[in-house]
Structures are given as structure tokens and as C-alpha cells.
Amino acid sequence: MSQTQRDEYVRKLIEGELDYLFTVDMFNEGVDIPAVNQIVMLRSTESSIIFTQQLGRGLRKFPHKESVVVIDFIGNYNNNYLIPVALYGNTGDRDRARKNLQRKSIGLSSISFDPIAKERILKSLDTADWSDMKKLSEQYRQVRYELGRIPMLTDIYNYDPSLPYTIASKRSNYLDFVRSREKSLGKGKHHEATFEDQLEPVTDVEDAILKMAAELLLPGLRPHELVILAQLCHFVSERLDDDVPQHWSAGSPIGRSELLDAIRTEFPQSDGSDTQFDSAISVLDYSYFTGPNCNRFGNQPLVEAVNSTGTENGTAYRLNSRFADMLATNRTFRIFFADTLRTGMANCRDIFREAAARQQVFDHMFLYERKYSMADVMRLCGWKKENTPQNVGGYLLDKETNTMPIFVKYAASQYEDEFLSTQEMKYFSKNGRTPQSPEFRWALNGIGPNWGQTHFVPLFVMRKAEEAEGKYYYVGHVAAFDNPQLTTKPDASGQGSVKVTLSILRLARPIDPELYRHLVS
């Protein structure tokens, strides 16, 4: 079809000579028809970007036009999870997309889904592969094209705050992802100019440190490590394509009280206790990690304590000298580590800003309805030493912090943990435990109005449909263990039985009905 013919059909549509204009692979972008007030979608859309472009054909203001009606006849196709992704601008976080689906408006626009379409989209959200390399590569190329250079995580964050962690965790770290994409862009029949030559090689230890930063610092769940590193590193702004490399050197040691003040000042809602600070230091000096994780993250401390006569308690902290030397001598490593740190700080600020906007109060370091991995929970409980998931099992008591997180993989059956109501759960202990076992003696000690001051039992629940993700919803803390009784249940073989303690966990507050339905569905 010639441009003249196309313009003529558009004119007829605007002037009312045509009621509908059907297009295939046309009008996705670069077409401005403000008068359009109805969009009918008749085939599946495999890209959230194209979906948004198609939707945008009807979003321009026009005299006497009060709304646009979107009739979507293909809401049952496999990728229909892209509909809320396109509408609400989230492309990297399944749970945020689910929450967005509950929203009725975006700015001045209102959105509604019929119940069947909503149910199908929710099912699609459960099965969608959010880390599909093809989709992530498309998003990387989009930002790269707009910037004309290698996009850093801060650039990805500005494009879509939900994407940095998804992209960085697709490979060992974000530098590894970038290197793989730049190599890919330089190959194939549609090869493009590549910026691979801007990336210096990094050592195995440097790569492992970037991996640790991507896993622990980038999500921004706790500000302590981020603030401590920001204070000690004093990174300057620099880019891979800078003509003249920036000079960087490690700063002077900073006292413990000064670092604590910085955390409390920038994040007053956070837990500024010595327990959390010491836990963060143990992460940064690597004494927190188990042997396998320590090796996986490079076995290289980032900070170290030094004696200082000029500080209040004689303790100060500085960057580990070997780590500081890595930062000073390898520009690529320094830029990507600093970028991960900045993006983690941006994510952390978002978490605290969103909590304040929703008038949410942190329960110790946890936010209701947010998802956490088992590793996240151990760290945020303030433990000085992590444990293996096998040792944690369904729960683990840490007497030093008086915390005992409970983890439930929800699949209701006769011999499984099960919600009895929005505030109570039938809960089976580990095998072989009795009401006289240490964790139950601890839980039943000091029962009374002040029990919560000496006991913190956060409850985390994982949906069976989300098991591959490995994360649990925080549903609140347990206020009481009601009626613990010794009982039995079938063993793993199904041929015998094992002793367990059955008790009723009573939450401090009922679970929100929407989240409750989501968990038990």
C-alpha cells in the first residue's frame, strides 16, 4: 500500500466515512491519529513494547473525545501477562505485575478487566519466564539504542526499575550479561557495531565480587551495607566511553559511630541497631558466609576493622587493601561495582519511599506482603553467620538475636502446614521434635504482654506455583504458639510414622483477604 493510499484511509476514518480501519503490521509506531477512540485487538501481541505502541494509537487527546475503549479479543493467549506489563510499565517482576493488576487507574486513566480475563492473566503471570534471554536481550538493545552506548544498571533502572535485578541475575553478574550481549550483537546476519572493546578483562575474584554485589546489594533490601560501602568508597561518576580515565583511590578509615549515624540519617525508618550494623559488617568482611558461599563470592573481604584512637569506641572501618587495589587498577571492575552499588541504593530508597507512601511500618527489617529468599531472611534477621537451607529446614532458632523465622511451602493437605483462617495456621514441627525441644521451650518462655519484645517469629509462605523462584511472602510475625501437642505423621517413605509437634500459629494481625486468596489458590 502506498503512503498516499494510507493517508486517504486515515482521512476517511477521521472524518467518519469509515467506522473501522483494520491493519496488519502497520500503525505500531510513528502514526498519529488523535481522533481514534476505539482500538480492537484481534491477534496476539508477543512484545509489551509493540502492545504499548498499538495502545498508544488511541491515547491522544482530541476535541469531544473523553476516553478510548480497548476491546481485546485475544486475552487468552499464552503471553497475556504482557497486558499488565505494558499498561503499568513493569517488565521484570512477577509479583509487582500481579499487584498492578489490582490497580484501577493509571494517572487519569481507569482500567478494568472482566473476571475471566483477570483470572487468565494471573495464571499466565505464574507460568511466564521473566528471565527469558530473548526478552531481556530485546530490552537491553532498546536501552542501548536510545543511549548509543553500553547501558549501565542505573540506565536500566531509569528505563524500568523492576529490570536491573532480573537482568543482572540472568548471568553471573551484570558485566557478564553485558559482555555476552555485546558478543552476540557482533555476530549473526543482523550484526551491529559492538562496544565489547570497552570492557577490560576481570579476574575470577573480581567477577565473584560482582556476583555477590548483584545478589546481595542490588536488591536494596537493607541499607546498611550500601551506606557503609558508599561512605568508604567515595566513587566518582565515570563512564566506559570516557576519553580520559578517572583517578580513584581509597579514602581514610571511618569510625563506627559515624557510619551508624549515616545509616540512621539517610534511612530513619530502618533498624539502626548495633545488631543490624554488626550483621552488615560481617557480610562485608565475609565472616558471615558459609564456606561454599564465601568461595562463590571470591573469598575476598571488602572491608576490615582497624583500631582508631580518634573514634568514640576505638573502632573504625576501611576498604580491605586488596579489594581497594582491584578497584584502583581495573576501571571496568570499578565502574560496574560502583554502578551496582548505586542501583542498589536507588532500589533501597524506592522500598523505603513506597513503604512511607503506603504508611507501612517495617516489622524489624521486613515489609508485609514483600517476598524474600531464605538467604535474605537470615541476613535481615541480623544473624552474624548464615546457615545452609538444609539446616534451616522449615525454621531455625538463632538465640543470639532471639529470632526464629518460619518458612512454609504451601500445599494444603492432611499432613501439611495449612491456614485455618486469615490469622491462624496449623503447623507441623521438624521431624522428631517435641514440646520439650529447645525451640518450643524458647517459644513458650515468658508468655505474656511483653513476649514480643524478647521473641521475633516472622512467618514466610511460598506459593506452590512460585516454587521455582525460591521466595516467600512475608505475612507477619507470630504472636503465639497455641496448644503445642506431640503427634505423628507419615514418614517420607509412607510406610511408617515420625513424631512431630503440632501447634497453631497465631499471627499478630490477619492476612489481607487478597493476599490470602493468592496464597491458598
Identify the meaning behind each predicted range.
Residues 21-36, 56-58:
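SF2 helicase motor core recognition
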Residues 466-521:
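Compact mixed alphabeta submodule
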Residues 194-388:
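C-terminal accessory/interaction regions of large nucleic acid-associated machines
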